[in-house]
């Protein structure tokens, strides 16, 4: 007999873009136990025609095969196109050199040989932070990364600016052999619109407000998985085509209990802060408003929607939740789409 799987699609209309988020690149893998992964992927592609095979294999937990499928897809795409690899849009990173192929939906990230003076970290520390994210619950808020060694590119597909910049910043990680450029170690992530560029170019106030709300939710949800994001400048976040804000800069992340959230001492002395004793793990949330977003109207919006982020008490409450080992369930979909939805019955908030 032929088995059938029924998907309820009533008056509320289940849409593919909402289903897509469940299998999204910012969520942890399902680790599906199936003898027929190819058939499962084929079924899911009928529901999600915009998802590539490698994305679905990875979402199901077949990570290594997903990497193989990605490389095949990448090679086929490069052979079928003629655009050039170029530096990715946005502010250049202090730790990574990031580039992309405009016609392809990923970015390539290479650890620089030397970091900016403000970054007191090592190459191994960066790798360790990326491994931490890989093994953590990403709750739909941290982009998945795919680590490759000796990844090959066609040399003639690099524009001059990118090739020069790679030689300047990542000489120890690249090798040129005849007509190929080999990168000894790199990470690949899904390409998103950097949040700072989105907020700069967007004119719709409602969309701007939604993005700022998403930014606050993103920070809070990551913290509830026992990870402190560290560098929370809005340039380190991206926004997807579905309007979700995702974090993608991991070199300064740490566990929540590794930080001491403090108040700024109240004083009439304008020089009091200059003499304040600060330990390396001290964090002052009251200062977050000065660097998460820059422009005043964006700061005001963030404080209105997520003002608790700027208080030490809130962060200490999150630390207590993490210490108790509580598991918080963040559904990636509106509760009205749940099979168990009962109108009028309060559910976990849609986050």
Model-derived segments and spans:
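Short, solvent-exposed coil/turn linker segments
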Residues: 36, 194-199, 255, 279, ...
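Conserved ATP-binding subdomain of kinase catalytic cores across diverse folds
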Residues: 1-202, 214, 224
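Active-site-adjacent segment of 2-oxoglutarate/Fe(II) JmjC oxygenases
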Residues: 130-147, 265-296
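Short, surface-exposed, charge-dense and proline/glycine-enriched linear segments
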Residues: 122-127, 140-143, 257-271, 329-335, ...
């Amino acid at each position: 007999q032929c088995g059938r799987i029924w998907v309820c699609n009533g008056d509320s209309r289940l849409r593919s873009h909402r289903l897509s988020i469940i299998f999204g690149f910012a969520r942890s893998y399902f680790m599906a136990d199936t003898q027929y992964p190819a058939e499962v992927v084929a079924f899911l592609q009928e529901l999600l025609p915009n998802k590539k095979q490698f994305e679905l294999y990875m979402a199901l937990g077949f990570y290594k095969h997903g990497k193989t499928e990605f490389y095949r897809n990448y090679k086929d795409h490069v052979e079928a196109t003629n655009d050039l690899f170029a530096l990715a849009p946005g502010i250049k990173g202090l730790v990574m050199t990031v580039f992309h192929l405009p016609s392809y939906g990923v970015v390539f990230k290479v650890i620089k040989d030397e970091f900016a003076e403000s970054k007191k970290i090592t190459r191994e520390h960066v790798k360790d932070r990326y491994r931490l994210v890989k093994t953590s619950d990403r709750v739909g808020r941290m982009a998945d990364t795919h680590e490759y060694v000796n990844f090959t590119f066609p040399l003639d597909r690099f524009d001059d600016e990118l090739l020069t910049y790679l030689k300047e910043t990542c000489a120890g990680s690249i090798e040129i052999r005849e007509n190929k450029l080999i990168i000894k170690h790199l990470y690949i992530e899904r390409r998103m619109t950097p949040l700072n560029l989105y907020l700069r170019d967007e004119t719709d106030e409602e969309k701007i407000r939604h993005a700022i709300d998403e930014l606050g939710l993103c920070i809070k949800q990551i913290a509830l998985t026992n990870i402190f994001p560290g560098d929370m400048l809005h340039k380190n976040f991206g926004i997807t085509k579905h309007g979700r804000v995702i974090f993608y800069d991991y070199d300064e992340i740490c566990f929540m209990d590794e930080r001491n959230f403090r108040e700024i001492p109240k004083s009439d002395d304008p020089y009091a802060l200059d003499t304040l004793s600060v330990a390396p793990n001290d964090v002052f949330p009251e200062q977050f408003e000065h660097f998460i977003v820059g422009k005043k109207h964006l700061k005001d919006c963030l404080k209105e929607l997520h003002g608790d982020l700027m208080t030490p008490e809130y962060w200490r409450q999150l630390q207590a939740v993490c210490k108790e080992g509580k598991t918080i369930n963040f559904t990636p979909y509106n509760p009205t789409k749940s099979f168990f939805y009962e109108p009028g019955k309060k559910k976990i908030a849609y986050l």
